[in-house]
């Protein structure tokens, strides 16, 4: 582990966990397996091991670090804003839980910065959605539906404004604030 051979260390430490179950060595091994996967860049597996650690050892020696690295691993696994943001929401929840459990932690500032970035990801997704409505403009889709529907006068500009207004309410400190205001006008 100390030499950076994380894949070998992960295999050996995983075996130690089952052999040493119930001892301090199993606790340390479980945390170190998470760190191995984190070091290899396998963020989802790392977050799984860190979650297992703090659920198994809530008052363990590495409980604070495990919660932090769970959130950080999920943060690192977040997709770009144009994709599904379920992972972003999961990372936000985990980081907020960390702040609830450890408000005075040395990691607090880092966690706040990660939360800010994740909120901006969600705001960017909303901006792209509003921009799509704006670009669609008065397009109503199916001609037959448009001529027979009582909502035929409704258009995508209204959807753009509503999406932008909702995004400003939900993410008031986002970096896209000015762009949302332009779309609303």
Whereabouts are the PLM-identified features?
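Acidic, polar-rich low-complexity tracts and alpha-helical solenoid repeat scaffolds
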Residues: 1-185
